[in-house]
Amino acid sequence: MLIWLVELSEYFKFLNLFRYITFRTGAALFTSALIVFLFGPTIINSLRIRQGKGQPIRADGPQTHFKKAGTPTMGGLMILAGIVGASLLWADLSNVYVVATLLVTLGFGAIGFYDDYLKVTKQSHMGFSGKARLGIEFVIAGIAVYFMMRTALASGVAGSTFGSSIAFPFFKDFMINIGIMFVVFGGFVIVGAGNAVNLTDGLDGLAIVPVMIAAASFGVIAYLAGNVVFANYLQINFVPGTGELAVVLGAVIGAGLGFLWFNAPPAAIFMGDTGSLALGGTIGTVAVATKHEIVMAIIGGLFVMETLSVIIQVGFFKMTGRRVFLMAPIHHHFEKKGWTESQVVIRFWIIAVGLAMLGLSTLKLR
């Protein structure tokens, strides 16, 4: 919104700063963190009073988790406030990619909020119906992908099929056009990302730091993909307008830092599905917008690993009646093996950093 003040730069030279994505990204990060820091304590106290027993703890989980009973959930409300507030201030709201990303952020956040609400009120892990939840997520993601696809097609930068094509890392010009099915593909990426982060969010600080790492990585990718000079130099797809998504991701990082202040062990609040679905959906949307969906599987490899562990566990158990892991998602398996919570969290952070570096290296490998 503040970018519109650039029109007054003829009279106030300092307003020229608002032209620069890098400046607004830093400002969004700071603003978002400040919002969470300022309103976090009030939100936490309010949720603690309203929820009473807080988030239900799994009876079959590690014994160390029972001491977390009574910790409030829905901390994603703090994150959403930071992201949306900072984005409204610093991002270009006439940009379709920004609007589509915020649509997913808020839409997935609302789904997660309803799921958290049901879990808290019932004191059960059985929240929103899985099929209904996925169905609504696909509708929201599909709408966002459709409008982003149309915007990319209208740009005409790389031909009439660019918006509906899948790009592949390591190859300069290799793309596969799948037409309108790109809406389904993009929706799958976004929904998958949202639920992958949701599965990862099981320990204090475990999900939020890898999310910030992924956000920083995709902030770089969005900035480069939206700049014709950098895109041509690196031989990646130039997608006009996606540079503005770096501002939104700056807000994600700021909100993440603010939330981590309160989520650091012992956590004063959990982000819940409200936060995890929204954050994952946001990252997934940026990946689709920038044509780096496959690279997201590398940068977000930790989330992929967590998701695969659940799929393998459930599938193998249905076929054989036996389990591959002591408990899924896989971070609980390592807890059962005797790792402390801090060991699991920090080691998974290290993995996330390594995967992000590997993912970013694909930008130069053409």
From Swiss-Prot:
> Which CDD domains does UniProt cross-reference here?
GT_MraY
Bilayer disposition of the protein: Multi-pass membrane protein
Q: Write out the GO MF terms.
A: metal ion binding; phospho-N-acetylmuramoyl-pentapeptide-transferase activity; UDP-N-acetylmuramoyl-L-alanyl-D-glutamyl-meso-2,6-diaminopimelyl-D-alanyl-D-alanine:undecaprenyl-phosphate transferase activity
Keywords on this record?
A: Cell cycle, Cell division, Cell inner membrane, Cell membrane, Cell shape, Cell wall biogenesis/degradation, Magnesium, Membrane, Metal-binding, Peptidoglycan synthesis, Transferase, Transmembrane, Transmembrane helix
EC number(s) per entry: 2.7.8.13
Protein localization: Cell inner membrane
This entry carries the following GO cellular component terms, namely:
plasma membrane
- What start-end ranges are recorded for coiled-coil regions in this protein? none
Transmembrane regions listed in the UniProt entry = 27-47, 71-91, 93-113, 134-154, 174-194, 205-225, 245-265, 268-288, 294-314, 343-363
Q: Which reaction does it catalyse?
A: UDP-N-acetyl-alpha-D-muramoyl-L-alanyl-gamma-D-glutamyl-meso-2,6-diaminopimeloyl-D-alanyl-D-alanine + di-trans,octa-cis-undecaprenyl phosphate = di-trans,octa-cis-undecaprenyl diphospho-N-acetyl-alpha-D-muramoyl-L-alanyl-D-glutamyl-meso-2,6-diaminopimeloyl-D-alanyl-D-alanine + UMP
**Pathway recorded for this protein:** Cell wall biogenesis; peptidoglycan biosynthesis
What are the names of the required cofactors?
Mg(2+)
Chief localization class? membrane
GO process terms (BP)? cell division; cell wall organization; peptidoglycan biosynthetic process; regulation of cell shape
Described function: Catalyzes the initial step of the lipid cycle reactions in the biosynthesis of the cell wall peptidoglycan: transfers peptidoglycan precursor phospho-MurNAc-pentapeptide from UDP-MurNAc-pentapeptide onto the lipid carrier undecaprenyl phosphate, yielding undecaprenyl-pyrophosphoryl-MurNAc-pentapeptide, known as lipid I.
What family, per the record?
Answer: Belongs to the glycosyltransferase 4 family. MraY subfamily.
Which HAMAP family does this chain map to? MraY
What PANTHER family does this protein map onto?
PHOSPHO-N-ACETYLMURAMOYL-PENTAPEPTIDE-TRANSFERASE, PHOSPHO-N-ACETYLMURAMOYL-PENTAPEPTIDE-TRANSFERASE HOMOLOG
Q: What is this protein called?
A: Phospho-N-acetylmuramoyl-pentapeptide-transferase
Biological source species: Rhizobium leguminosarum bv. trifolii (strain WSM2304)
Give the organism's phylogenetic lineage. Answer: Bacteria, Pseudomonadati, Pseudomonadota, Alphaproteobacteria, Hyphomicrobiales
Q: Which gene encodes it?
A: mraY
